């Protein structure tokens, strides 16, 4: 969705086709050995970026909002009630609706076998994957607050193990700036 096939999704959004599109965002091409995509976050190591990705993650939800679609939202299984509510809301609407669900990839992210839900929760609570919704491309609502430093999220993943303190701080500043932007848009 982020790269391959994006032009079709963008065209459907521009026409406001009656589609409920759900993107499972695992932040890379995980079916080909954990290669980078435009969904891969800044500094994350992948098979094709062993030194870490040097560009930020594409804001797909924001791009859909820029098309003026009736509904675009992010969600996480770590916040199941929020996810269910958004799915029900999207199903009740007409036009193109898009939900982006964060789906941690255990081997691709280098997580312990039992850490998928923990990673999803920390991604949301650190602001690395903000959970929010946008109606009609304009009305932003943040659904889960940012309550933790990103370092807590990074330390459980092998793809970030090579980061030094300066890179972690730079990533925190990037996340804080993105969060501040969302808060401005929510007003």
Spans of features found by a protein language model:
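Thiamine diphosphate
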Residues: 1-31, 71, 78-85
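Short acidic, glycine/serine/threonine-rich loops at helix termini
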Residues: 4-8, 31-36, 109-114
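Short, solvent-exposed amphipathic alpha-helical segments in soluble enzyme
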Residues: 9-13, 37-39, 88-92, 114-119, ...
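Generic secondary-structure signature for well-ordered alpha-helical cores
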Residues: 14-17, 27-28, 34, 65-70, ...
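Conserved thiamine diphosphate
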Residues: 37-93
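Generic secondary-structure microfeatures
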Residues: 76, 102-105
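Flexible, low-complexity linker and terminal segments
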Residues: 104-187
């Amino acid at each position: 969705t982020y790269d391959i096939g994006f032009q079709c999704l963008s065209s459907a959004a521009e026409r406001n086709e009656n589609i409920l599109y759900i993107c499972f965002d695992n932040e890379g091409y995980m079916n080909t050995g954990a290669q980078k995509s435009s969904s891969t976050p800044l500094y994350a190591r992948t098979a094709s970026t062993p030194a870490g990705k040097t560009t930020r993650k594409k804001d797909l939800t924001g791009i859909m909002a820029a098309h003026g679609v009736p509904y675009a939202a992010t969600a996480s299984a770590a916040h199941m009630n929020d996810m269910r509510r958004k799915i029900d809301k999207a199903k009740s609407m007409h036009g193109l609706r898009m939900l982006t669900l964060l789906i941690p990839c255990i081997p691709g992210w280098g997580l312990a076998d039992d850490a998928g839900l923990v990673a999803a929760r920390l991604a949301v609570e650190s602001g690395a994957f903000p959970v929010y919704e946008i109606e009609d491309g304009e009305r932003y609502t943040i659904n889960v607050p940012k309550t933790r430093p990103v370092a807590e999220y990074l330390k459980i993943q092998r793809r970030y193990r090579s980061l030094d303190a300066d890179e972690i701080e730079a990533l925190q500043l990037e996340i804080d700036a993105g969060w501040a932007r969302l808060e401005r848009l929510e007003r």
